[in-house]
Design a protein with these regions (language model features):
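Flexible, low-complexity junctional segments that flank or bridge functional domains
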Residues: 68-307, 321, 331, 505-537
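Short, small-residue-biased leader/transition segments that mark boundaries at the very start
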Residues: 1-5
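Surface-exposed loop/turn motifs at beta-strand-loop junctions within extracellular Ig-like
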Residues: 36, 51-53, 231-233
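Low-complexity "stalk/linker" and mucin-like segments enriched in Ser/Thr/Pro/Ala/Gly
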Residues: 10-28
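C-terminal "post-core" interaction segments
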Residues: 276-279, 283-294, 298-306, 315-537
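C-terminal edge beta-strand
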Residues: 54-67
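A short beta-strand micro-motif common to beta-rich folds, especially ectodomain repeats
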Residues: 41-52
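Short, surface-exposed loop/turn segments at beta-strand-coil junctions that are enriched for proline
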Residues: 35-41
């Protein structure tokens, strides 16, 4: 037959291409190339095979299920291609992305969440990417942001009164108002004399009620208002509130920054020769590491014997800053010892990649960072610390707890269980369409020197108490419930024993919150345990 082939095959549809259309009769391999279905309905193609010498051909049917219809306009296709490439390389559960159908035509935020949701649909393999309440994921830790100021970090500019947090509250049967929970130093609110525990009963002459607290709360956050302020004391063993008018206060509005350190002070323990350094630390930010070191210098100058680290409102930040703080606490005796070990996805681990951060060692996985080494000269060198925690305490904050415990430093926790973020993120920035896009996928587990990382359910406090129903007192004093317990622990060297009723809700100085003013606040830190983002060109 010479060059005459004895077998021919053809397809009835262009999407199903026969790549070995002709060949010799007998046993041979038939190769098909099938295109992805982009239509909403299933489809089929008939493959017909004719063999020389046989009167009738034979055929079979190739069926393909419903395809993916592009739902977007494709404006951000180049952004999405970059996001997908980085996620497939860096995401901690990157191998599961191969099983996700991706629509590159979507807006970048929908596309990003389609990846996360697609991985989650595979038996929640990325369960540790996010905060859960029961069986419900409340949010993902991984994030993608553009230039739009959706959330910010310590040091960024805001406009308003400078109140970090308010709470709409009822006191007993007689009083309703808005309680000041946290005031940012150096802001109009601080300059006007507002402090934690002030009780606002009217805004611009309008009394606070359960129907208007949202709008009045926003007005107080924004500033440029007149507020009626009261101080609160308690009688009858802390069961009866007494309001004392402080008068009307003109609350201004200005541009301000939210620093990482809201307060550092030294508290002398009564009937004791002990002194406690108190640090209200709101976010791990490398821009404030020099101030952090200076705060420890002030502690050293006053010969503090103990440290109360208040991380109730600290949801994390820079891994480098966490290592600086760990070094300032641990000191020279732990120099060179492992503070945190980063474990990456399977592909990177198989390639031998990992990352370490050590006490007092400036060489880190991500960069050479001098303040870590310099922190040794300013360290307290403690074997025991007291940490005030809440559900907001997360990531780089939990890294401090876990890292110090890995060194056998005693870390005593007071408050409520922490967030449980045992993972961190490597960031990357790239410009598209004259906008910057910042991508922070979860890309590593955080382990301590003992290899422990199993705290996705959070750290359980040694003294567990919900202070959200206890009227707030000034930070770093005996009037602050968690601060009081820490100071008592330091004074007696014994863990405080609480009445059973106080393990969940306060039994004295009781307040009843009736509305959420958390989401309305202008200062909303990003948090996380993050490595400094790398800019790609």
């Amino acid at each position: 037959l010479g060059d005459v082939y004895k077998r021919q095959a053809r397809s009835s549809a262009d999407w199903c291409e026969v790549q070995t259309g002709s060949g010799m009769a007998g046993e041979s391999l038939l190769r098909l190339k099938v295109a992805k279905n982009t239509r909403a309905e299933a489809r089929s193609a008939t493959i017909t095979v004719s063999v020389w010498g046989y009167a009738s051909p034979v055929s079979f049917v190739v069926k393909q299920g419903k395809g993916l219809i592009e739902q977007g306009d494709g404006k951000y296709r180049s952004v999405n291609e970059w996001v997908a490439e980085y996620m497939k390389s860096r995401y901690l559960w990157n191998r599961a992305i191969e099983n996700v159908s991706l629509d590159y035509s979507l807006c970048y935020d929908f596309f990003f969440f389609s990846i996360l949701d697609g991985v989650a649909a595979q038996d929640e393999v990325n369960r540790e990417d996010g905060h859960w309440q029961g069986q419900k994921r409340m949010y993902y830790y991984s994030r993608l942001e553009s230039d739009a100021p959706l959330s910010r970090t310590p040091g960024e500019a805001y406009v308003g009164s400078g109140i970090y947090l308010l709470d709409a509250t009822r006191l007993g049967d007689d009083y309703i108002g808005i309680v000041v929970m946290v005031v940012i130093p150096g802001t109009p609110a601080a300059e006007a004399g507002l402090v934690r525990g002030d009780f606002i009963t009217a805004v611009n002459g309008e009394e606070v009620t359960e129907s208007n607290y949202q709008s009045l709360g926003r007005a107080v956050y924004d500033g440029a208002v007149d507020v009626t302020v009261n101080s609160v004391t308690w009688t009858d063993n802390g069961t009866t509130p007494v309001l004392t008018p402080k008068g009307n206060v003109q609350l201004g509005s200005a541009t301000f920054t939210s620093p990482a350190i809201y307060m550092d002070k030294v508290v002398e323990i009564e009937e004791s020769d002990k002194k406690a350094g108190y640090l209200l630390y709101m976010g791990f930010d490398v821009d404030y590491d020099e101030e952090l070191i200076a705060a420890f210098d002030r502690f050293r100058a006053q010969n503090v014997t103990d440290l109360i680290l208040d991380l109730r409102y600290n949801n994390g930040g820079d891994v480098l800053s966490s290592t600086v703080l760990g070094t300032l606490i641990a000191g020279e005796a732990y120099k060179g010892q492992l503070y945190a070990h980063m474990t990456f996805n399977e592909d990177r681990t198989e390639a031998g990649e990992s990352g370490d951060y050590k006490i007092g060692v400036k060489e880190t996985f991500e960069s050479v960072y001098e303040p870590i080494e310099r922190a040794l000269q300013h360290a307290l060198g403690l074997k025991k610390i007291y940490v005030l925690v809440s559900e907001t305490t997360a990531s780089a904050s939990e890294m401090v707890i876990n890292g110090l415990r890995g060194l056998d430093i005693e870390v005593n926790l007071i408050g409520m269980p922490t967030n449980g973020k045992n993972v961190g993120m490597e960031g990357v920035v790239r410009s598209f369409h004259n906008y910057d896009f910042l991508l922070f996928p979860v890309s590593f587990y955080i382990e301590n020197a003992k290899g422990f990382r199993d705290y996705s359910d959070g750290f359980t406090p040694d003294v567990q108490i919900d202070d959200s129903a206890i009227y707030p007192g000034e930070f770093g004093t005996m009037m602050d419930q968690l601060g009081y317990l820490a100071l008592q622990w330091i004074k007696t060297d014994n863990k405080p024993q609480l009445p059973s009723a106080m393990h969940t809700r306060g039994s004295c100085r009781s307040m009843r919150s009736f509305g959420d003013l958390w989401e309305n606040r202008p200062v909303q830190p990003v948090g996380g345990a993050v490595m400094q983002p790398v800019r790609e060109e």
